[in-house]
């Protein structure tokens, strides 16, 4: 199989900038990963971003309960060391994934069980705020609120 695609080397000279559209959780996590590979990361969001964990127009799902399953929690902890402890100190609940919740499947509650994996129950507001605060501690990252993309 032949291809006309020829990869080119990324120029080493000059600053490299990543631009991320959106400061919701997906954009914040993308910006965090980009910060490891770019000299500057700019995040643009149309909303005013609150200084505290409060509702914002661009994240209407923020009032719903959120669960961060074990693998996701571990990945976030790797990106932001100490995140889990900080969230728990602010009211999030860390529990065994099998013991900390009940499952209703096809009209029947299933028995709890020890899964050996820790999941986190946390408000979307708190999770997004804590991730944004930690991301802004990185001098390579800037977030511009009230900016149309």
Predicted regions: what they are:
Residues 2-13, 37, 85-86, 110-111:
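Domain-scale detector for complete catalytic domains at protein termini or as standalone homologs
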Residues 7-48:
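N-terminal Rossmann-like FAD-binding beta1-loop-alpha1 element of flavoenzymes
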Residues 33, 37, 52-102:
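N-terminal FAD cofactor-binding segment of flavoenzymes
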Residues 53-54, 108-115:
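A short, surface-exposed helix-loop junction/capping segment
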Residues 65, 76, 127-142:
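N-terminal Rossmann-like dinucleotide/flavin-binding domain of flavoprotein oxidoreductases
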Residues 67-68, 114-133:
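Short beta-strand to alpha-helix junction loop
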Residues 145-149:
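A conserved short coil-to-beta-strand element within the FAD-binding core of flavoproteins
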